[in-house]
Amino acid sequence: MSKSIEQFPKDLSSPLIQLKSSVEKNSKLHIKELFALEPERFQNYSVKFDQLFFDYSKQRITKNILEQLVALANNKQLTQWINRLFSQDKINCTEQREAMHWALRLPSEYSKFPELTKQVHIQLQRMYTLVEKIHAGQYRGATGEVIQDVVNIGVGGSDLGPHMVTHALADFKVKTAKPLNVHFVSTMDGSQLSDLLHQLRPETTLFIISSKSFGTIDTLSNAQTVRQWLEKALGKHDRVVKSHFIGVSTKAEKMNEWGIAPDNQLLLWDWVGGRYSLWSCIGFPIALTIGIDGFQQLLAGAHAVDEHFQNTSFERNIPVLMALLGIWNNNFLNIQTHAVLPYDGRLKYLAAYLQQLEMESNGKSVQRDGQKVELDTCPIVWGEVGPNAQHAFYQLLHQGTQAVSCDFIAPIQRYNADHFTYVENAEALIEQHHLALSNCLAQSRLLAFGNEALDVKELEKLPIYKQYEGNQPSSTLLLDELNPYNLGMLIALYEHKVFVQSVIWNINPFDQWGVEKGKQIANQLLPILNGAQNDLSTLDASTRGLIKILLGKAE
């Protein structure tokens, strides 16, 4: 249990004190015993919504604990905070901004915020126009050749979300007049760019500079390198930059200075946080891959969850339940690491995306009022595609000393839709999908029940090093299939989970001040490494020593 709970005043009516008491009463209760006590546990601890099914019966909770968690949410005024989120209230208190990523997926006919909806759809329509032009082979480079490769240059929210979704929905790639490939570059060291550029032709390559501030050094250093690459091949003409770059940013003036043509500038707003921005024109690579209809389905899925989140009682509200279960595991069971385990290779980049979404949002230690937090905040979030992870770190999950909570994620169906082109080996692929599903179920069962999941006769002969303690809590999210609509739903679930937890912890999930100072210090060190400055006197001994090694001046 989190040590910070011990500091609370002994107000016996406080939901936190009641939850602490529940830990003391139920700490030795095993998941297998919870199922024995409640024959209808699966039905009682699962929710079906639209094309999603959420099973949390393998969590270490009881009906009483769930009621206390809901009471905690009410005590923290969660309903009022949800209403504030879905308004134009400046709930990003440290930056005095709204947090309106939900507005990016409003239907065009939405009447509650007509001006806001209009602004969003103007920019989306401008993006759709470019998508149609590129798909039709009508967008041409400086030499008149058709664009066949598009490279997204971004980092953080301008890379992780679009990259994750584009990879996950590759099966839904639309046909274009000429083959179109979408690539992603993010690392500031240039290694990705170096590997990619020799595969591309300058005449047929378009670059997206995706940066909310249009000032991120990682992104602009890569952009400057490709600009030099293009100008070396095609000449230093204005038309080269105007034809081969699209900008996505809040800063039109900076895009103008860089030379990007006005028609190739797609605008964001300050109220869109980077890690919440894939629904905006930051999602341009997604729309290029799955088409306008596919992108609109992605938005529709997220909007459906927005409606579910606002209008469903907490007891049946999936993002609220996900958040409260995380609070229970982290703050009361002292489980401070959480694994995301998708059993579908298309979700390869989901864990990395959720790491940013959760840890950059809720990795805070100061409350909204400027006081230190009273509870531990975000756990360490990590993960991998489940079948691969089984051969990497499941040993620790099953027999290690760390308590870990898990999310298992899987599509129910695959290889059965008309657009799939697997007819010649469909039967074998369906069998492989079933193999992945069977492993997903087996692992969650073994983590929960431990030895109870084993054959009794087998258990009698097993040495202790082959036995399983179990009692590792997990939830399972099943999607009818992995398509744009359902992926939009899945992402929005996690967005709102993060928000609910921020309310419980009384922190601001929409800033990221912790990442700012490191960038500034790097800018101070760069002139030293470049030889423009040699004063190391203000640096610590370790940094001085490392710089000397890097410069070949080690003593």
From Swiss-Prot:
Annotated compartments: Cytoplasm
Record-annotated active site: 360 (proton donor), 391, 519
Catalytic activity: alpha-D-glucose 6-phosphate = beta-D-fructose 6-phosphate
GO molecular function: carbohydrate derivative binding; glucose-6-phosphate isomerase activity; monosaccharide binding
Record EC number: 5.3.1.9
CDD domains to which the protein is assigned, alphabetical: SIS_PGI_1, SIS_PGI_2
Pathway named in the protein's UniProt entry: Carbohydrate biosynthesis; gluconeogenesis; Carbohydrate degradation; glycolysis; D-glyceraldehyde 3-phosphate and glycerone phosphate from D-glucose: step 2/4
GO cellular component: cytosol
Function (record text): Catalyzes the reversible isomerization of glucose-6-phosphate to fructose-6-phosphate.
Superkingdom of this protein's organism: Bacteria
Keyword Isomerase carried by entry: yes
Group of enzyme by EC: isomerase
PANTHER family hit by this protein: GLUCOSE-6-PHOSPHATE ISOMERASE
Keywords recorded for this protein, A-Z: Cytoplasm, Gluconeogenesis, Glycolysis, Isomerase
Protein name as catalogued: Glucose-6-phosphate isomerase
Homology family: Belongs to the GPI family.
GO biological process: gluconeogenesis; glucose 6-phosphate metabolic process; glycolytic process
Source organism of the structure: Acinetobacter baumannii (strain AYE)
Pfam families: PGI
SUPFAM superfamilies linked: SIS domain
